[in-house]
Regions:
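Helix-rich C-lobe and terminal helical cap/extension of kinase-like folds
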Residues: 130, 139-143, 147-163, 190-295
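Intrinsically disordered or highly flexible coil/loop and linker segments, enriched in small
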Residues: 75-79, 98-99, 115-119, 173-177, ...
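Histidine-centered active-site/metal-ligand motif
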Residues: 35, 179, 183
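Conserved kinase catalytic-core helix
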Residues: 109-116, 151-180, 193
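Short amphipathic alpha-helical signal-transduction/dimerization elements
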Residues: 67-74, 168-173, 228
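The start of beta-strands in P-loop NTPase/AAA+ ATPase cores
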Residues: 44, 132, 176-178, 200
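Conserved ATP-binding subdomain of kinase catalytic cores across diverse folds
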Residues: 1-145
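Hydrophobic residue at the +6 position relative to the catalytic HRD Asp in the kinase catalytic loop
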Residues: 185-189
Length: 295
């Protein structure tokens, strides 16, 4: 806590006196620490994401050191693809410590979902934000993997699952940017009462949201469409034009298409996919992940 307090004082100055901050973190990670806080003037509950001192400045040197280690040990072939991947990781690391970008992304998603009662996005509180501190409203909820979630009726769990998948599909087909770190820690569920108050998904962390170029988005959309229609040739065609797939021998592509069709089985329409295993669809023609072979 002393190091975190010193960082807060350096970043927020006198504004820090406005807040009562819990010394125990809500969560810790390699780049930052999250603390709960309360604004004294009105009792507003907040969350402060506090970047560790020196993290942003160390990214390039640490990444270069890691890259040299890989070269010396020859653990990874030194190819153009590796260079592209490494530069991509470096760029993503810099984005994750750029709290201005994360604040803007959070606002963008909040605006998109503000009229949808199934989702909650924290509100950014600019007054207590800086280059290395991100402040937002505290949003209550239970973890995705909480035993409470397992005790929910199946229909409520289905609705939460559908809402989660809908976000992913809209990211690809509508918004053109995706959450590239969809781990359970980035989500909570605010439970309703099963009647007039519905369950809501709380979206917490937008630091790993990545925008994709139109070409890659077109490839991804066509792959998903091919899965929906469960069409092997359509799947092969969807692969064409993307460097990774174009480098694969033509003789292998049909087999790879079969793998992709299996991976997108849950998105295929029953009328298009006669290969669906028996019992994998429920009485309402919905895909039952628990009975599938995909998990």
């Amino acid at each position: 806590w002393p190091a975190i307090k010193q960082q807060l004082q350096a970043q927020l100055g006198a504004k820090l006196d406005d807040l009562t901050i819990d010394h125990e973190p809500l969560g810790t990670a390699s780049l930052a620490q999250v603390h709960r806080a309360t604004r004294k003037s009105d009792g507003l509950e907040l969350v402060l994401k506090i970047q560790y001192p020196g993290v942003a400045d160390a990214i390039d040197s640490d990444m270069s050191l890691f890259r040299n280690m890989l070269k010396l040990t020859r653990m990874v072939p030194q190819t153009r693809e590796f260079d592209q991947w490494f530069d991509e990781v470096r760029e993503m690391m810099h984005r994750e410590v750029n709290y201005q970008i994360e604040a803007e992304t959070t606002r963008r998603f909040a605006a998109r979902l503000k009229d949808d009662p199934r989702y909650i996005v924290p509100q950014i509180v600019d007054e207590y934000c800086s280059d290395q501190v991100l402040c937002m409203t505290f949003e209550r909820g239970v973890p995705i993997n909480s035993p409470v979630m397992l005790s929910l009726p199946q229909e409520r769990r289905n609705q939460l699952g559908e809402a989660s998948l809908e976000i992913a599909v809209r990211e690809v087909f509508e918004w053109g940017e995706m959450q590239t770190d969809p781990n359970f820690g980035n989500y909570l569920v605010r439970l309703g009462n099963g009647e007039d108050i519905h369950d809501k998904i709380v979206l917490l962390d937008f630091g790993a949201i990545r925008q994709f170029d139109q070409h890659l988005l077109t490839v991804a959309r066509n792959l998903i469409k091919a899965g929906y229609y469960h069409d092997p040739q359509m799947m092969v065609n969807a692969m064409t034009g993307y460097e990774f797939f174009d480098s694969i021998p033509e003789s292998i592509k049909p087999d790879m298409a079969k793998v992709f069709l299996l991976a997108t089985e849950a998105f295929s329409h029953l009328d298009n996919n006669r290969d669906l295993p028996a019992g994998v669809m429920d009485e309402q023609s919905r895909y039952d992940w628990k009975k599938s072979q995909l998990h």
